[in-house]
């Protein structure tokens, strides 16, 4: 059961628009609020005495960058910390399970080398040391390289969509593990009617990130979206209540950054059929949102994962 729970907030878009009249102050307040949450998470980890932090969240929740932010906060508080990505435990595309329609099931935990994950986590728990595999994403297979890890008496943060799945941590005693679920907790309304939900924001984050930094067209991202949501329901959200800490990864001023970029995607990329309908419907939800300049993004903002590239 989550011991640190954050209820969702419903914010009037008119209230956001008033705050957006002072964009620098709104951005600073949003960034400061997130930094406080990260520091609090680091404090709770230290208090728990756990060696291993398992951190998950749905797609585009900011789990990867948040893991690195928490690691920095731990280091600033005097605790050595390293981040391990479960992506490096992928078996390789040839071993991926398939969905009923024949497409690869990227969200399935069987894409990972579960026995090796268990072994590495047990070694980290017992000795503070292990050797990690390195995945070659361009070749879509495990490389010949390996990465030695030494916690030096500190903490490792293991991030990935399956991090809270108990199959991964079955060989580690419970006291050595602290579990974090990262997710957005702020939604937006007009006269009390919800207009923009967290799923809308995550779709925008993922689409803009993939187009700006991963070379993936919005059409491809939008085509995969239903599969992504289905995978979250089947493999991620069921373990949410097992977390010790719910990390809120919302930024109020992000609403204006998205509003600024929605039209760019429509002008620069070709979208057809269902993809065009999905993007246009999402864009309509933001039509009353005052846009904000990307220049407001600090160099070290977590949001640079999503809006730091050129769309």
Regions found by a protein language model. Give the residues of each.
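Charged, amphipathic alpha-helical linker segments immediately N-terminal to NTP-binding catalytic cores
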Residues: 1-40
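Conserved NTP phosphate-binding and transfer environment spanning the P-loop NTPase/kinase superfamily
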Residues: 2-3, 23, 28, 169-311
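Glycine-rich phosphate-binding loop used to anchor ATP phosphates in small-molecule kinases
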Residues: 47-49, 118-176, 222-239
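Hydrophobic anchor at the beta1->P-loop junction of P-loop NTPases
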Residues: 53-55
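Conserved lysine of the Walker
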Residues: 63
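Hydrophobic positions on the alpha1 helix immediately C-terminal to the Walker A/P-loop
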Residues: 66-70, 85
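Post-Walker A helix-loop "phosphate-sensing" segment adjacent to the P-loop in P-loop NTPases
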Residues: 72-82
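Conserved nucleotide-sensing/catalytic segment adjacent to the nucleotide-binding pocket
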Residues: 82-84, 91-140
């Amino acid at each position: 059961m989550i011991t640190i729970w954050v209820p969702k907030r419903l914010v009037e878009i008119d209230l956001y628009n008033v705050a957006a009249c002072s964009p620098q102050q709104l951005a600073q307040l949003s960034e400061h609020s997130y930094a406080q949450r990260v520091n609090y998470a680091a404090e709770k980890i230290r208090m728990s005495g756990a060696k291993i932090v398992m951190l998950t969240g749905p797609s585009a929740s900011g789990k990867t960058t948040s893991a690195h932010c928490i690691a920095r906060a731990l280091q600033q508080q005097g605790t050595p910390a390293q981040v391990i990505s479960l992506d490096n435990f992928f078996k390789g595309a040839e071993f991926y399970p398939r969905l009923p329609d024949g497409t690869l099931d990227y969200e399935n935990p069987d894409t990972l080398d579960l026995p090796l994950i268990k072994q590495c986590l047990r070694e980290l728990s017992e000795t503070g040391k292990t050797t990690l595999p390195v995945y070659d994403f361009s070749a879509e297979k495990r490389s010949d390289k390996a990465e030695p890890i030494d916690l030096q008496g500190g903490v490792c943060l293991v991030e990935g969509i399956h991090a809270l799945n108990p199959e991964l941590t079955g060989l580690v005693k419970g006291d050595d593990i602290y579990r974090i679920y990262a997710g957005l907790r702020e939604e937006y309304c007009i006269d009390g009617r919800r207009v923009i939900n967290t799923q809308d924001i995550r779709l925008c984050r993922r689409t803009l990130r993939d187009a700006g930094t991963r070379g993936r067209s919005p059409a491809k991202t939008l085509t995969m979206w239903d599969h992504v949501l289905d995978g979250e329901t089947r493999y991620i959200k069921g373990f949410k209540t097992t977390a010790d800490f719910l990390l809120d990864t919302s930024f109020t001023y992000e609403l204006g950054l998205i509003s600024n970029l929605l039209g760019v995607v429509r002008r620069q990329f070709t979208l057809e059929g269902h993809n065009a309908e999905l993007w246009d419907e999402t864009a309509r939800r933001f039509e009353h949102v005052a846009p904000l300049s990307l220049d407001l993004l600090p160099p070290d903002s977590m949001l640079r994962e999503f809006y730091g590239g050129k769309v």
